[in-house]
């Protein structure tokens, strides 16, 4: 009986230790000795992983199908954020959930802090619905900063600097891996400029107010509507769109995600083609930030007659 008890206790303890070593609220298997950093959106996670792999465990909250900009954390999410070594924030009004969460200020890293003067104000705050997510409001400040790839580079540098300060023993590796990432982003920046500069007067319409930094940096001649890829626009929205085309003769509508076939067909009846330029705020189903941006380059070349 005593032998059975000891064996059972030992097995239980070993199982507990094994589960604790690999536990991770994001479903990842990680070592218990790595520092944990949370990122408020996928671009920041990607940047941080590129800089710090394999030294830091960089995690995303469980957003599900929700846009990270309008995510509201559960009590479990808040606890995980409070226990993290650092929390990377986009800034520019991106994290509306911060108003309802108490986190140690010493662990918060606002990656856009050094270019606040370059924030783009929205013409007006707008409230609308994203399907099952319910109503939400776009703030008075545009927040998809990383679509200006020069600003993405600055966010990368901010992550590198705080990691180097927090874990100075790894500074050399952080700097080296950051340098490689910055070169890739700078090459993408140059490619976008080259594509658009061939004919910047081409009129386009953006499906959603998330392309402000992109349009500003690269000089796109764009106007914006508030449409969702899988929600058929109302009659009033179609009428507003037709009115817009009266003064802005666009032939392309640029979407965040693949629109429904019914929307595509209706647009084609108006001689409007659809193309997807994914901001990549959430983790893609396949590939990574770099591969999504490569697909975006293909889409952009199509719009500008280079494909």
Predicted regions and their residues:
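Extracytoplasmic metal-acquisition and chelation regions
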Residues: 17-307
């Amino acid at each position: 009986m005593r032998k059975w008890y000891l064996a059972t206790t030992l097995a239980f303890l070993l199982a507990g230790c094994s589960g604790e070593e690999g536990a991770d609220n994001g479903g990842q298997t990680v070592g218990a000795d790595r520092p944990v950093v949370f990122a408020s959106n996928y671009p920041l996670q990607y940047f941080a992983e590129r800089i710090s792999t394999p030294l830091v465990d960089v995690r995303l909250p469980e957003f599900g199908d929700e846009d990270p900009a309008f995510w509201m954390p559960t009590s479990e999410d808040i606890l995980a954020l409070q226990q993290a070594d650092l929390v990377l924030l986009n800034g520019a009004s991106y994290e509306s959930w911060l108003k309802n969460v108490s986190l140690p200020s010493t662990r918060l890293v606002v990656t856009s802090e050094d270019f606040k003067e370059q924030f783009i104000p929205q013409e007006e705050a707008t409230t609308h619905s994203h399907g099952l997510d319910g109503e939400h409001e776009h703030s008075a400040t545009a927040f998809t900063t990383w679509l200006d790839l020069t600003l993405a580079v600055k966010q990368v540098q901010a992550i590198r600097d705080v990691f180097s300060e927090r874990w100075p023993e790894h500074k050399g590796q952080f700097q080296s891996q950051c340098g490689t990432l910055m070169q890739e982003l700078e090459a993408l920046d140059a490619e976008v400029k080259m594509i658009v500069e061939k004919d910047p007067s081409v009129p386009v319409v953006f499906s959603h107010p998330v392309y402000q930094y992109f349009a500003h940096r690269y000089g796109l001649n764009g106007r914006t509507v508030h449409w969702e890829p899988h929600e058929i626009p109302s009659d009033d929205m179609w009428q507003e769109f037709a009115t817009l085309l009266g003064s802005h003769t666009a032939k392309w509508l640029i979407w965040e995600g693949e629109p429904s076939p019914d929307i595509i067909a209706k647009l084609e009846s108006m001689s409007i083609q659809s193309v997807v330029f994914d901001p990549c705020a959430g983790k893609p189903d396949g590939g990574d930030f770099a591969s999504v941006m490569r697909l975006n380059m293909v889409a952009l070349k199509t719009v500008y007659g280079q494909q």
